Amino acid sequence: LHQPKLLLETCSLSGQRLTAGSDYELELQLKNKHTTRKICNLKVTLASEENSLLPETSSAYFPEISPGGTATVKTKLHISESAQQKSTPLELQFEYEDDKGTACTGSEKTLLQVSQPVGIQMEGFQLADTLYSLDTVSGTVRVLNTGKAPLYNVQVQLQVPGLFPRESVFAGTLEAGQTGEGSMNIYVGTRDMKAVGESSQGSDEEKYGLVEGKLVLTYEDAYGETYTQEQ
């Protein structure tokens, strides 16, 4: 007689992106694949090789599973803050007996997608308090990846009425903890100008005076999701 075999049928967190440092409700459905023999005294143990997936309850017991029947393991799963951003295996170890009392073992594995939260800062950008029309000035900005995963296509743009950057600062890919730095040359026009080379017909009050604007930081994570941050 073939011994009854236990398989993992479904995992409630499969296909989801799990953020490091967060908690999730986990349900694992197990199925006895034998059509005529039951499984008895089943112990299920959950484990992660790198201790990055931490179940609140690491084991579960089921007195029996009927032929073709199922059992569901339910527990809260904590994702370690230090977990690497990657597909991480959650392992299930089975210890049970068949209906004749013969000891059996088995194992299953499911991959869970762990992601790190993004973190980024801009600093160091300054211009003189007074700028003169028709001048070209330069500004430098630093971008720091404060998270634990790479960021891609990191770019900073300046948006201020009357100031026209000749280029944006493109930092490209920033690894975790890495700093990117770049400068932009900025043409100083007038407050009412919409584009470089456009003649200004406004009064002095319309052309000159205080202006306010922002730096716009854009970047992508490893999954291609785009983020925007303003300062």
Say what each PLM segment does.
Residues L1-L18, N51, K109-Y132, L163:
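Low-complexity, acidic Ser/Thr/Pro/Gly-rich terminal tails and inter-domain linkers that flank the onset
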Residues L1, E81-Q113, V188-Q231:
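Terminal connector regions
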Residues A47-E56, D99-G101, Y152, V160-V169:
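Short aromatic-acidic-glycine turn motif
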Residues L54-E81, L163-Q201:
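Intrinsically disordered, low-complexity Pro/Gly/Ser/Thr-rich segments with frequent PxxP/GP/PP motifs
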Residues T36-N41, S87, K148-N153, Y227:
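Short acidic/proline- and small/hydrophobic-mixed sequence motifs that coincide with surface turns
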Residues G21-E27, A71-V73, S87-L90, L134-T140, ...:
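Short, solvent-exposed loop/turn segments enriched in Ser/Thr/Gly
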Residues A20-T36, D129-P150:
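Short beta-strand elements of extracellular/lumenal beta-sandwich folds
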Residues L42-L46, Q155-L158, L215:
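Hydrophobic beta-strand segments
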